[in-house]
Regions:
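Core helices of alpha-solenoid repeat scaffolds
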Residues: 57-61, 123-124, 154-155, 187-188, ...
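Alpha-solenoid HEAT/Armadillo-like helical repeat scaffolds in large eukaryotic proteins
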Residues: 34-39, 63-71, 94-105, 126-134, ...
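Eukaryotic acidic, Ser/Thr-rich intrinsically disordered low-complexity regions
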Residues: 402-450
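Structural detector for internal amphipathic alpha-helices that build alpha-solenoid repeat scaffolds
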Residues: 10-27, 37, 47-56, 66, ...
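Extended alpha-helical scaffolding segments
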Residues: 49, 60-62, 66-67, 73, ...
Length: 450
């Protein structure tokens, strides 16, 4: 009780309640700090008596909220009665984060309904702290009430959709803003914030609304947007206006410096024959263009192992990642020797991490002895995450059909990784590999897991 707790820290009030359940205070003429302790007492009779004295102590309202969900009926009803009497709009704004947090527990709906009902009469200015609260549940609650009560203009809703990081708030506000201007007009007030938003959901909503606003021509520049959902919406609007997105994509990809999003867009709506426009771009000076070209070739299912192999050593992580994804279905056609060389380079001077990760992913996809060999090799990698990944692969490894029984390399590799196994599991793995000198198999009475 030496530390002051404010309304803005809902978790602190719950922790206080949990910490003080066993304090032996009796509620008779208590001062405010002592009364707070009594309100958290384990005995329901003491909590009920403390509630009688809590009237007039605004600072203790968070604890009253807590006891609105008390398991003792008398305590619960008295707390709800006090909360009804004490809550006004300012108090409801202050208590909303705690109410929503505690409302996730059983019997928490009462406080949510009460605070929500009071907030419906609040002004937009009183909502401001809730609109920017760090807890997304609070922001969702506040924006939902504001939309239902019509507290925000279409422009304010559009700016909220563009600003908020939560997808639920983005969708809620964008849809409400567009629904409002569909009835009243004034699209410009809504379109500018949405089209300029950082988040793709808001931009996609704005692009889709261009058709209703009679501004179809503006959708063309969003055909090369960095987001796939925005590009899809832009293609729809352009087609509705009589345009041909595919022709535009083809023209842009023939340019000397195409927009990366246009490269992806060509693959999204193009044909396999359009791969001829993408292959030259895998050697483009821009890493983003190279990566998008590789992703487009994968999407069009036009993969050439020989032409893509050099890109596994690209200095840009995004390019190596796309090349790896494209080659994974054909991992069996990728020579494992050069890939292993990228895992065993001398440290600290060796291949970059993203190159080693790409090589390991392809070797892991090969399975069998190749997978085990690669996984044991990266146990000595300087990158901790890659070492952990390798250890997990080793521990899950089992001999596969088609492997040669009794392969001495398997025994040598498992021996290097013996610190990852118990003696029993190591013995079992070696037996599975058919190595000589090990038991013919665990007995049926063995209680160890396989």
């Amino acid at each position: 009780m030496d530390q002051e707790i404010g309304f803005g820290d809902p978790l602190a009030w719950i922790r206080l309640d949990e910490a003080l359940r066993r304090e032996p205070y009796a509620p008779a003429g208590l001062a405010e700090p002592q009364l707070a302790v009594a309100l958290c007492h384990r005995d329901g009779r003491i909590r009920e008596a403390a509630l009688q004295q809590a009237v007039g102590y605004r600072a203790l309202l968070p604890l009253v909220v807590v006891w609105c969900a008390d398991w003792v009926g008398q305590v619960r009803e008295r707390a709800r009665e006090l909360l009804r009497e004490a809550v006004d709009t300012d108090t409801a704004v202050a208590l909303a984060p705690l109410v929503l947090l505690f409302g996730r527990r059983g019997r928490g709906a009462f406080a949510i309904e009460l605070v929500g009902g009071v907030l419906r009469s609040a002004s937009p200015e009183q909502f401001d702290p809730l609109f920017v609260h760090p807890d997304r549940a609070v922001r969702r609650f506040a924006h939902r009430l504001a939309v239902e009560e019509g507290l925000l203009s279409p422009g304010q809703l559009a700016r909220a959709a563009a600003r908020d990081a939560d997808t639920v708030v983005q969708n809620l506000c964008a849809e409400a803003a567009l629904a409002a201007v569909a009835k009243t007009g004034g699209h410009d007030e809504v379109l500018e914030p949405l089209l300029g938003a950082r988040n793709p959901r808001a931009r996609a909503s704005g692009v889709t609304a261009l058709r209703a606003a009679g501004q179809v021509e503006r959708a063309e520049k969003f055909l090369g947007d960095r987001s796939g959902v925005v590009r899809a919406c832009a293609r729809y609007v352009v087609r509705q206006g009589g345009g041909d997105p595919l022709a535009l994509y083809r023209a842009w990809c023939l340019a000397a410096d195409p927009v990366p999003g246009a490269v992806s867009g060509l693959a999204e709506c193009g044909e396999r024959g359009d791969a001829a426009l993408l292959w030259p771009l895998v050697s483009h000076a821009s890493a983003s263009v190279r990566a998008r070209a590789l992703g487009g070739l994968r999407l069009l299912d036009v993969v050439d192992v020989r032409r893509m192999l050099p890109l596994l050593d690209d200095p840009a992580p995004g390019v190596v990642r796309e090349a790896t994804l494209a080659l994974l279905p054909s991992a069996g056609l990728v020579p494992d020797g050069p890939l292993m060389e990228r895992l065993v380079g001398g440290w600290p001077k060796g291949w970059p991490r993203h190159v080693r990760v790409g090589a390991f992913r392809l070797l892991d996809a090969r399975g069998g002895i190749v997978r085990l060999r690669a996984a044991v090799t990266v146990l000595d990698d300087p990158d901790e995450r890659l070492r952990v990944w390798g250890a997990q692969v080793v521990q899950r490894w089992h001999p596969e059909e088609g492997m040669t029984p009794g392969d001495a390399e398997v025994g040598e590799l498992l021996g290097r990784a013996r610190h990852l196994f118990s003696d029993y599991v190591l013995t079992r793995r070696l037996w599975e590999a058919g190595l000589p000198g090990w038991p013919a198999g665990p007995s049926s009475s063995d209680s160890h897991p396989s």
